[in-house]
Amino acid sequence: MRLVQLLGLPPACDYDCITFFYAEADGLFRPTTDHETTDHEAELDFPASATPDYREWFEDNKQFSYFSDTPYPWTRLGYTYDWHCGTSSHVGPGEFIIREGATVRVAAKTGIWSWYREISRQTNRQPGI
């Protein structure tokens, strides 16, 4: 459950693996109003260059995230919302979305808990993050 919280996923999710992949930067975008992948801050308003299709996708995603039968936290700022009650900061990892038609190369696929244990071991952190 802790990993689900860290990644800002709905509590009822049933994920059991994680996939690592490579993609060109121009094949990715961030789920923010300005969707740039090269800066470190998200603007709160759409830039003039935002296309109608992107604005529609963004607004649809907001509706689904907040107002569906299974709402879940979406920051809209390019990082996940870590909804664990015991964390001092609710800022999770950065979010990137693969653009439709982008080429990706799968580097590895592993069980989620195997990955979690390895990360915990490498960072000398106790499970629970």
Segments and roles (model prediction):
Residues 4-129:
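Conserved NAD+-utilizing ADP-ribose enzyme module
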